[in-house]
């Protein structure tokens, strides 16, 4: 029984990830596609610097908390680069990571581009043993656990853009590396591959209003699949609001402001899954500052 309880505790980060994914992601990903696709590095006419924060399942002790800082820019008309650092904490476990990305784009026709991107990743997993309480204080399983573990990985993506639309595919955690913090076979975990498909279309109603529906599909090799539908409306390129539906998981209203050089957004995940009994929802903030020139294509 003792081992079973410990296994559950140690695996909280990973087992909740089968629902919320091992790779934490934002509900407002549509504002910066580089957050989920390395091939989007350099896809806009600006250099967006994106700062994000998300608190998942508010009111639930030890619930996940996620921070990230990223930036990407084009080098020329065919090449782009990007970088991202993030921290993800769940209970007594934490995951710190960094990505370096390179993208190469091929122009197709007058307004279309097809880009391929690759990012090298480095993750550091940590356990705070002082927060672990056991029925038997002499249990050596925790004593011999690894405090920190560094795991390399990689991500690959493709990204096709047109005048008012985009489609992308990402394969994350390509290597599927093992993560064995407790140095025991029965608690060993693995970084499973994640597959993302995302697409959207921006429709200009008139000079003041535009609507952008989008779709994000996520598939994890462990067997979990998730679909997310979003509709975002913008008024005079100043204020925006939207709503997402994550299948069998959450409804997500969101809103914010978007000026020439910056964007601010807030999203609230209203939990629909069994976690709603314990959770008071999830809060998310995102801030984007755009360096360099600004063009209408930057929104894509």
What positions do the PLM features span?
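Short, basic/polar N-terminal leader/transit segment immediately after the initiator methionine
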Residues: 2-5, 22-24
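Positively charged n-region of N-terminal signal peptides that target proteins for export
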Residues: 1-4, 108-110
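Sec-dependent N-terminal signal peptides
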Residues: 4-16
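Subset of outer-membrane beta-barrel
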Residues: 21-300
